[in-house]
Amino acid sequence: ADIVGTPGTAINSISVPQLMSARLDQHTAPMEERYTQIDSVSNATLITGLASLMNPQKDISRQYIKGSIGEMADSNFIKNNRIWTMQNSADVLGEINAGTLTSGITALTVDGFSAAPAEGMVFTVEGIYDIHPETKDAYPHLKQFVVTAGATTTNLTFSPAMIFDPANPRQNCSGTPADNNDITFVGAASSNYLQPLMYHRDAFQFVTTNLQLVD
């Protein structure tokens, strides 16, 4: 998952939803059946920010009467006050400290951290760029990785794997990590921020066993 916008800053314009949709486009997600889970406060500030824009009259009426955004930026917006909140640890800046730097790694040896990164925090690595999943051409933005369980101040575990070998058909980033490359986390240290989520309908699946039939 990619994060766009500025954590902790109200979503008060269409630019952030458009960037969310653009990231899905860049990763070849289908353009139909997209949905966005958004908390009530973000929903309110976004509706206020859209008030001056030219929109279909029925959409404006729904926003004012129902307080719901409806469809925008190729996505159907749904209010949800159970949106997950990320709590950053007390340090968000560090760097690579040598170690194993081969393609496919899921952990980095690091230094410069005074506190262990929390599971779920998102970070980028200097010089490691996101790529188109089919053409493998590099995008201008850095690849984002998510901290997994077990990270410490010297060992940063993450997902997805950092696959930068051009010969690997599963390559997902461009560039080569190196000693002393900066590691930068999304958001400020010791801060909490909500994470509204835009996704395609088929991003998740619910699987269950057959229910027991009672005679």
What are these regions (language model features)?
Residues 3, 13, 40, 56, ...:
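Short linear motifs in intrinsically disordered/low-complexity regions
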